[in-house]
Amino acid sequence: MKLICRQSDLSSGLSLVSRAVSSRPTHPVLGNVLLEADADKNYLRLTAFDLSLGIQSSFTADVQQSGRITLPAKLLNDIVSRLPDGDITLAIDPDGDAGDSHLTTITSESGRFQIRGLDADDFPALPTVEGVKPLLLPVATLNEGLRGALFAASTDETKQVLTGVHIKGSGDSLEFAATDGHRLAVVEAPTQIENDEGEAVITGSDLADFAVTIPARALRELERMVASQGNSDLVSLVVNDTQVIFELGDQRLTSRKLEGAYPAYDQLIPRQFSRTVTMERKRLITSLERVSVLADQKNNLVTFTLQSPGNQLQLAVEAQDLGHGEESMGAEIIGEGGQIAFNIKYLMDGLKALPSNDIQMQLNEGNQPVIFTPLGGLKMTYLVMPVRLVN
């Protein structure tokens, strides 16, 4: 194998795929990146796979001799990322000694490095899905859905299906939902986009029976992949009984599906409320950021006091043996006043994801779920469970 490529192309490709390399590989080759050079098509393809998540990326290179090799992911990335911008050469001597048959030489204008790899034939193939019509999703749909829901997925691996985001068709939109048992985020992201002939790329019939739960880890990598793309660019998605595959240009992401029925989250959302508070989102966030400095690290609570006659919302925190902090802000309050407490982190996560400046908080008496929604813009619901106050 011998090729010449740009340092920037190889470095960005390695940064992307290396995120699918296992930190504790069950086999040495899973700690490596697979490099495949094709002289006929003049491209270099990079692949990483931890048997659950796989990422593949290709780019143009001057391939003088085709070949395949796997190289240690972290070592290769550390070297290439530090090389100066410009052309670099990767070469393997096929006639080398038996012990050096996988020795790869990396040459740049600054110097020369040699890395010993492992046989490419030992690297597991990425899963494929055959005979399934791909769903073409606008990047804007994925960006909106993931930005509004991904943060609420559970990080507790024992909760299995809750460590993912549930995505399902809803009319001409995709509904993204995530919950960790303490909060729930639901986003309805429109999919309407037309091709050059003015025809809808995706229709309600395409989404009618679509539903899948995908690990949050895989979707975070997808979010990074599409971040630099245009909103009208299309991502291909195919799903079978066990796998999901996203493709965008020369990039591909594969992931296992999460098995099991996702909770019926619609039933958790109250339909009627006794109190409604309308307020400015950014003002609330900055007030929370200030008072959170004094929040008790053990429970991380903030108490909201609704002062209905005066249309004031008071925020208060208490840290035992440290002190007390409070702030007030204007708010439009409909219904009786009262007190309610929240975990500050859960509250802040949701407020930062809401897409509009003016938001509404809807609540009932006692410790029933509280709903936050944006006024205008994207249709999003953020449900958070309040914390019981002990007098």
Swiss-Prot record:
It comes from the Bacteria. Keywords: Cytoplasm, DNA replication, DNA-binding, DNA-directed DNA polymerase, Nucleotidyltransferase, Transferase. The keyword DNA-binding applies. Transmembrane segments: none annotated. InterPro entries: DNA_clamp_sf, DNA_polIII_beta, DNA_polIII_beta_C, DNA_polIII_beta_cen, DNA_polIII_beta_N. One of its GO terms (biological process) is DNA strand elongation involved in DNA replication. Its main location: cytoplasm. GO terms for molecular function: 3'-5' exonuclease activity; DNA binding; DNA-directed DNA polymerase activity. One of its GO terms (cellular component) is cytoplasm. SUPFAM superfamilies: DNA clamp. Forms a ring-shaped head-to-tail homodimer around DNA which binds and tethers DNA polymerases and other proteins to the DNA. The DNA replisome complex has a single clamp-loading complex (3 tau and 1 each of delta, delta', psi and chi subunits) which binds 3 Pol III cores (1 core on the leading strand and 2 on the lagging strand) each with a beta sliding clamp dimer. Additional proteins in the replisome are other copies of gamma, psi and chi, Ssb, DNA helicase and RNA primase. Belongs to the beta sliding clamp family. Confers DNA tethering and processivity to DNA polymerases and other proteins. Acts as a clamp, forming a ring around DNA (a reaction catalyzed by the clamp-loading complex) which diffuses in an ATP-independent manner freely and bidirectionally along dsDNA. Initially characterized for its ability to contact the catalytic subunit of DNA polymerase III (Pol III), a complex, multichain enzyme responsible for most of the replicative synthesis in bacteria; Pol III exhibits 3'-5' exonuclease proofreading activity. This is Beta sliding clamp. It comes from Synechocystis sp. (strain ATCC 27184 / PCC 6803 / Kazusa). The gene is dnaN.
